[in-house]
Amino acid sequence: KSGHRHESXBSTBXASXSSKPCCBHCACTKSIPPQCRCSBLRLNSCHSECKGCICTFSIPAQCICTDTNNFCYEPCKSSHGPBNN
């Protein structure tokens, strides 16, 4: 066990491009205001705006953001490539 922990504090600006808030799989309720939640899995950390990030203990860790917002972030797909469904 090494003390290797990923804190999603904004300590580095290097990862800002990859960790900018975006979401490919976002679902919203039909209520007003809507309650939207992103179900994207990210490796090792959640995006920079995420307050509730849960990660698995696998390597690499798979992380999901549990935040509920009244909007969806822009899709991330442009950074991943065309065939990502």
Swiss-Prot record:
GO cellular component: extracellular region
Sorted UniProt keywords: Disulfide bond, Protease inhibitor, Serine protease inhibitor
InterPro entries: Bowman-Birk_prot_inh (IPR035995), Prot_inh_BBI (IPR000877)
Residues the UniProt record annotates as site (Reactive bond for trypsin): 30-31
KW Disulfide bond (keyword) present: yes
Annotated spans, Disordered: 1-21
Biased composition (Low complexity): 9-19
Site entry: Reactive bond for chymotrypsin: 57-58
Superkingdom of this protein's organism: Eukaryota
GO MF entry, a single one: serine-type endopeptidase inhibitor activity
SMART domains in alphabetical order: BowB
The protein, known as: Bowman-Birk type proteinase inhibitor PVI-4
Entry annotated with the keyword Disulfide bond: yes
Entry's family note: Belongs to the Bowman-Birk serine protease inhibitor family.
Disulphide bridges: 22-76, 23-38, 26-72, 28-36, 46-53, 50-65, 55-63
CDD domains associated with the record: BBI
